[in-house]
């Protein structure tokens, strides 16, 4: 996201007021669209569909939460599957089940990362209903998680979980284009759970992204933070790189930031000219395996939520009888 857009959406730039009339028009359009799709086009399913999404543009930390929820479901002995749009995937035939040896360019960075971190089927399709039907037909899953897709109202859902960035929150509170909201903040009152990533607010649940040991990309060995006593290059192609940089600072690692657009497809030339050890996010690392070297590292993170969330989650009426 450009610095200029950030100033409008997350600051007090005068241009937001010029764009407000267009935001009201946008609200009318999306409200009408939602009503129509839910009433005439939504497909319901015989098993729980859990949607993990957001109401803002940009990264909020959904994917680590999807991974954690999938693991918790597996710990209950249940068969889980994940559906994703497969943003920027080069493949053209859908639905497609992600394979561990696929490239991020072929299937998308987030689906590939999820497939490698969880022993469950991950299926991509721009039309998510196609991915859901594939999982039901091919894998007989008992619960499906949709990574993003809150606004994909053709897909029925049993539970809606919205993630909010604790640093940027809802920005200036306006819908597109004056602000970062895909839907008005009143939408939060209609979902089942609101989770704040690295923060807290009344009526929400707090989530922390816990950094794990840094991993050398070429060998997959964990290394100590003590290895990085001098400056490194912090490379991030995610929606909110500041969160990644803040984590490195908390770990005591000195770095030069290198920010790229979200879902940037890294090429060797992006990193070869950097004359420093490179630490990147795990989401970015999956795009660099084909040209990994000893100077490339990544920092995995794990979503952690308190017991009160999990108690409320498993007590949800749509999950009764599933544990």
UniProtKB/Swiss-Prot annotation:
One of its GO terms (biological process) is lipid A biosynthetic process. It catalyses: a lipid A disaccharide + ATP = a lipid IVA + ADP + H(+). InterPro entries: LpxK (IPR003758), P-loop_NTPase (IPR027417). Keywords: ATP-binding, Kinase, Lipid A biosynthesis, Lipid biosynthesis, Lipid metabolism, Nucleotide-binding, Transferase. ATP binds at residues 56-63. GO terms for cellular component: plasma membrane. Its EC number is 2.7.1.130. GO terms for molecular function: ATP binding; tetraacyldisaccharide 4'-kinase activity. Pathway: Glycolipid biosynthesis; lipid IV(A) biosynthesis; lipid IV(A) from (3R)-3-hydroxytetradecanoyl-[acyl-carrier-protein] and UDP-N-acetyl-alpha-D-glucosamine: step 6/6. Disulfide bonds: none annotated. It comes from the Bacteria. It is an enzyme of class 2 (transferase). Belongs to the LpxK family. Transfers the gamma-phosphate of ATP to the 4'-position of a tetraacyldisaccharide 1-phosphate intermediate (termed DS-1-P) to form tetraacyldisaccharide 1,4'-bis-phosphate (lipid IVA). PANTHER family: TETRAACYLDISACCHARIDE 4'-KINASE, TETRAACYLDISACCHARIDE 4'-KINASE, MITOCHONDRIAL-RELATED. This is Tetraacyldisaccharide 4'-kinase. It comes from Legionella pneumophila subsp. pneumophila (strain Philadelphia 1 / ATCC 33152 / DSM 7513). The gene is lpxK.
């Amino acid at each position: 996201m450009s610095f200029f857009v950030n100033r409008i959406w997350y600051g007090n730039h005068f241009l937001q007021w010029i764009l407000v009339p267009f935001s009201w028009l946008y609200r009318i359009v999306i409200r009408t669209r939602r009503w129509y799709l839910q009433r005439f086009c939504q497909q319901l399913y015989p098993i729980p569909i859990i949607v993990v999404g957001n109401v803002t543009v940009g990264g909020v930390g959904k994917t680590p939460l999807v991974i954690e929820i999938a693991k918790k479901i597996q710990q209950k002995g249940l068969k889980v599957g994940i559906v994703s749009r497969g943003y920027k995937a080069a493949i053209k035939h859908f639905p497609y089940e992600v394979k561990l040896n696929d490239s991020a360019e072929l299937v998308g960075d987030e689906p590939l990362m999820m497939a490698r971190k969880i022993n469950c089927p991950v299926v991509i399709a721009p039309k998510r209903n196609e991915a859901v039907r594939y999982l039901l037909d091919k894998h007989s899953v008992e619960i499906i998680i949709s990574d993003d897709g809150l606004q994909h109202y053709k897909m029925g859902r049993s539970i809606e979980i919205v993630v909010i960035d604790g640093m940027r929150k809802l920005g200036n509170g306006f819908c597109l284009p004056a602000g970062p909201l895909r839907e008005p903040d009143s939408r939060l009152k209609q979902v089942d759970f609101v989770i704040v990533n690295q923060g807290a607010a009344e009526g929400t649940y707090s989530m922390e992204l816990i950094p794990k040991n840094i991993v050398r990309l070429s060998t997959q060995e964990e290394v100590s933070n003590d290895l990085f006593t001098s400056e490194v290059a912090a490379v991030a192609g995610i929606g909110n790189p500041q969160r990644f940089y803040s984590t490195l600072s908390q770990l005591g690692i000195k770095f030069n930031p290198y920010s790229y657009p979200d879902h940037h497809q890294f090429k060797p030339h992006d990193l070869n000219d950097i004359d420093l050890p490179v630490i990147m996010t795990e989401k970015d690392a999956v795009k660099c395996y084909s040209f990994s070297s000893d100077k490339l590292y990544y920092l995995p993170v794990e979503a952690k939520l308190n017991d009160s969330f999990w108690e409320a989650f498993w007590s949800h009426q749509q999950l009764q009888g599933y544990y």
